[in-house]
């Protein structure tokens, strides 16, 4: 049976609706960076997703090509994920999606080395007639985070984020979102096949322990 990240790492891909704390180990990803409204038809985000899947499936099917990847085993392509921030916005303003800056990613199995990745980018570009040069091999070390399963539309995410923030305050933690540690979403549902109110999205935020001295001084 093919290895499935969602089943093997349930603590990362199948959290409960109730917020919880998780330490996320470093992982390698196919990544494409960009900016703009993710809903724009044929926009930068949708093009990035096409590149990600082209490279991801080239690697997945490499055992049926002349390429031999050391340590390869059959696996299910992991779900699409995204790291998000907004320029010039305090918090999140869902009414201004054009200001979103994002890193769209798909996780890589550990056996994929840099040269294997470069081969997949070249091969996908040639076979799919798609410019995949924007794809990069990216290692992300998220560390300590709070996460929860959000069920519903993307625009209703603030409800789940509010629950996460309340959980942090009640347990002595605070958000540690910065240019290097970003709001993270993992998309477990196909929006083309799932009703908006049934979409399942993992929401994850980087955190740190609160400073009691700082809190007491305010």
What residue spans do the PLM features occupy?
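A solvent-exposed interaction/effector surface
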Residues: 1-218
């Amino acid at each position: 049976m093919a290895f499935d990240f969602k089943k093997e790492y349930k603590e990362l891909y199948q959290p409960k609706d109730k917020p919880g704390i998780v330490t996320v180990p470093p992982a390698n990803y196919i990544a494409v960076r960009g900016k703009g409204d993710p809903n724009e038809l044929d926009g930068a985000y949708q093009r990035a997703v096409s590149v990600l899947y082209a490279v991801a499936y080239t690697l997945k099917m490499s055992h049926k090509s002349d390429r031999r990847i050391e340590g390869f085993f059959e696996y299910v392509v992991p779900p699409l994920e995204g790291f998000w921030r907004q320029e010039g916005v305090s918090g999140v303003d869902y009414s201004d999606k054009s200001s979103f800056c994002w890193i769209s990613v798909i996780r890589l199995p550990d056996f994929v080395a840099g040269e294997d990745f470069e081969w997949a980018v070249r091969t996908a570009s040639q076979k799919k007639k798609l410019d995949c040069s924007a794809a990069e091999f990216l290692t992300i070390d998220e560390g300590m985070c709070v996460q929860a399963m959000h069920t519903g539309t993307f625009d209703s995410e603030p409800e789940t984020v509010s629950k996460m923030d309340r959980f942090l305050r009640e347990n002595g933690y605070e958000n540690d979102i910065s240019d290097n540690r970003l709001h993270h979403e993992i998309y477990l549902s196909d929006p083309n096949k799932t009703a908006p109110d049934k979409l399942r999205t993992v929401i994850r935020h980087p955190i740190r322990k609160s400073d009691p001295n700082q809190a007491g001084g305010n």
